[in-house]
Amino acid sequence: MVSRRIYRPRDLFSLMQSTLATENFFISAYEIGIVDNFPEIRVQAEVSARENRVRRFGGEPEILISEIYDEILKKHPQLSPATVKKIIDLEIQMEKIVLYKNARGSCLFEKAISDGCKVILISDMYLPSVILKELLTSCGYDISNIPVYSSGEERYSKNSGKLFSIVKKNENVDITSWIHVGDNVHAD
């Protein structure tokens, strides 16, 4: 349904780094060290958060963005919680900037809606569903009455099939009449 204007998802962190380096972002001199290596710090924090999730709870390494930034705070205690909140907000804002409505996905979505199909959106993503809805809305989708599931919130992925089981149960849908459209042959 959406695509990014960047080559790899992690390129978002390089874009964030440029913004973090501006005077307008108000990172103190004490906190500035994070800017120089932000893309690597952000990637490693996500890896650590996933590993810690599995080590502590077992199961799948599905996490939320807050857990990623908790890892950054652990390794960079000089950051204030207020700065971390601003960086999380920046990441979400940057996602809005790089995301755009995918023509093929949009056509399929609109066709399903116009045909009266029950549409449910499922994402393997560390962002909570409320933020996913915000991102989709900013791309021009009307999803006001459409359920959105995030693997991070549910703690299960599409790849394992467990996220689909949760959706099936919660939405009371018959799996034999289910049509799933995705962009990843392995996960979808």
Give the label of every model feature segment.
Residues 1-5, 48, 52-58, 67, ...:
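Short catalytic/ligand-binding loop motif for oxyanion handling, primarily in non-cytosolic enzymes
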Residues 161-186:
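Conserved Lys-Pro-Asp/Glu-containing loop-to-beta segment of HAD-superfamily phosphomonoesterases
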Residues 143-147, 175-177:
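Short acidic capping loops at alpha-helix termini that bridge into adjacent secondary structure
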Residues 16, 23-90:
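A metal-dependent, Asp-based hydrolase signature
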Residues 153-159:
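Catalytic cores of eukaryotic secretory-pathway lumenal/extracellular enzymes that build
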Residues 1-10, 14-17:
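Asp-based phosphoryl-transfer active-site loop
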Residues 84-137, 148-149:
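Substrate-recognition element of Asp-dependent hydrolases with the DxDx(T/V) motif
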Residues 136-142, 169-172:
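Short, surface-exposed basic-aromatic patches at helix termini and helix-loop junctions that form
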